[in-house]
A protein has these predicted regions:
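Loop-to-transmembrane alpha-helix initiation sites
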Residues: 172, 193-198, 322-330, 352, ...
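A beta-strand-loop signature enriched in Asp, Gly, Thr, and Trp
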Residues: 293-349
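N-terminal signal-anchor module of multipass membrane proteins
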Residues: 1-121, 125
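Structural signature of hydrophobic alpha-helical transmembrane segments
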Residues: 114-128, 165-174, 261-272, 318-331
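Hydrophobic alpha-helical transmembrane segments
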Residues: 58-69, 122-131, 268-284
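Central hydrophobic cores of alpha-helical transmembrane segments in multi-pass inner-membrane proteins
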Residues: 124-138, 155, 175-183
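Long hydrophobic alpha-helical segments that form multi-pass transmembrane helix bundles
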Residues: 190-276
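Membrane-interface helix-loop-helix junctions at boundaries between adjacent transmembrane segments
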Residues: 146-227
Length: 409
């Protein structure tokens, strides 16, 4: 590394100031920070000194996704190999086969399941990451500022929220829309009012619904063979609930299956225990706000309980209790990694409770009341993103009035 450090020091003058390659400084700066810690220090005494910076925050979130990522790859392999065994096939029927065949299709092997899932997830992540960094670099060069690490988080969250069979070109389009429309046109990292990963996923959901919803996209291989053997279902637990309520869920899965993640779904959204590990990391490092988490849980429990009491003879979703809502769909993943994003969420402490409460109520209303969207977490968070500035404004104004009243007394 000393050789690389010396080389970067030697060529750095060409990239800074009026150097020959100064317009490419954002790329040089990104490469330097990739291999070496940020060395600039603020010496002026008026600045607050802290060991944390944007780079460390983004890396912490990125690492916090690893438990969900690795379990997700294993779960994709387990579900897909089970499906292939049920139709007596040992070939995915597409280009993934050439990668999977390196290890084989052994449904009894842990590593085989992990490798199978990796062969589906990693290409998606590679394409999303490459396209995302390319957009980040392009805007950094045009605006002449450093490349922020925000793309690291947006790309991994977007990839984990996708089904394993998502076409690579759609993955590229989704992250492009999310980063460009959801973040860069508003000024980049720190200035976006919508979560970029969710913005990209929402674009895919409405533009290409066949590839990101339904019963055939959550288990890799079903879309290739288009064969559903008798007694087999590739539907998610939330999809089953929307069709037949609690009886359908309990006949297909146990609560523990959903908690551990042994169910079909998006790559990173199935295992609640893996997501909770990530939540602990984010809370301990104070990257995520526990107030948003608490507000969302209270809102979700309250609204689902009210709908349980109200009941419905025609809508089976009314009967789903809160503890099932918490472990199915993308509720946990969205809460931990999307709702707690500090940029697009509320910034005041009181506002964070309200912001989370709005998400909790909205996700249940969309899931239960709206038959077109059995999964409501994505839309609930985006809706709360739009309200976050208003919430903070009202909280600040209320505090101003309170202080004025105290002063006048």
């Amino acid at each position: 590394m000393k050789i690389l450090r010396n080389y970067l020091n030697n060529v750095k003058p060409s990239f800074v100031g009026e150097g020959r390659y100064s317009k490419w400084f954002p790329l040089f700066d990104a490469i330097e920070n990739l291999f070496f810690s940020y060395t600039k220090k603020t010496k002026n005494p008026i600045h607050v000194r802290d060991a944390i910076d944007i780079q460390k925050v983004m890396v912490t979130v990125w690492l916090a996704t690893f438990p969900a990522m690795f379990f997700g790859m294993y779960n994709v392999g387990a579900n897909s190999l089970e499906y292939l065994d049920s139709i007596n096939q040992q070939n995915t029927g597409d280009w993934h086969h050439y990668l999977i065949s390196i290890v084989g299709y052994d449904s009894n092997s842990f590593f085989s399941k992990l490798w199978f899932g990796a062969c589906y997830f990693l290409p998606i992540y590679f394409v999303v990451f490459t396209v995302g960094i390319a957009w980040e670099a392009l805007f950094a060069i045009v605006r002449k500022h450093e490349i922020n690490e925000g793309a690291f988080v947006s790309t991994v969250l977007f990839s984990l929220s996708c089904p394993p069979d998502l076409p690579l070109w759609q993955a590229a389009m989704g992250i492009s829309f999310g980063l460009v429309i959801g973040k860069e046109i508003f000024g980049g990292t720190g200035k976006n009012f919508l979560n970029p990963a969710l913005t990209g996923r929402a674009f895919l959901y409405f533009a290409y619904p066949a590839q990101i919803s339904g019963d055939k996209v959550w288990v890799a291989g079903i879309s290739d063979y288009n064969i559903i053997p008798e007694g087999y279902s590739g539907a998610t637990a939330l999809g089953v609930a929307a069709e037949s309520g609690m009886s359908g869920i309990t006949n297909s899965y146990t609560w523990m299956d959903a908690f551990l993640g042994n169910i079909p779904g998006s790559v990173g959204e199935t295992s609640i225990i893996a997501i909770l590990i990530g939540l602990i990391i984010l809370l301990v490092t104070k990257v995520a706000s526990w107030r948003i988490v608490a507000g969302t849980l209270v809102g979700m429990i309250l609204m689902s309980s009210l709908l349980n009491i109200a009941g419905s003879d025609t809508n089976p979703m009314f009967a789903i209790p809160w503890y099932w809502h918490a472990v199915i769909g993308s509720f946990a993943f969205g809460l931990v990694f999307m709702a707690t994003e500090p940029v697009s969420g509320s910034g005041t402490n009181t506002g964070r409770y309200i912001y989370g409460f709005v998400i909790g109520i909205t996700v249940i209303l969309i899931r239960v009341i709206n038959p077109a969207f059995p999964e409501g977490m994505m839309l609930a968070i985006l809706f709360a993103n739009l309200l976050a500035p208003v919430i903070d404004h009202l909280v600040v104004m209320a505090n101003v009035k309170k202080r004025k009243a105290l002063f006048n007394e």
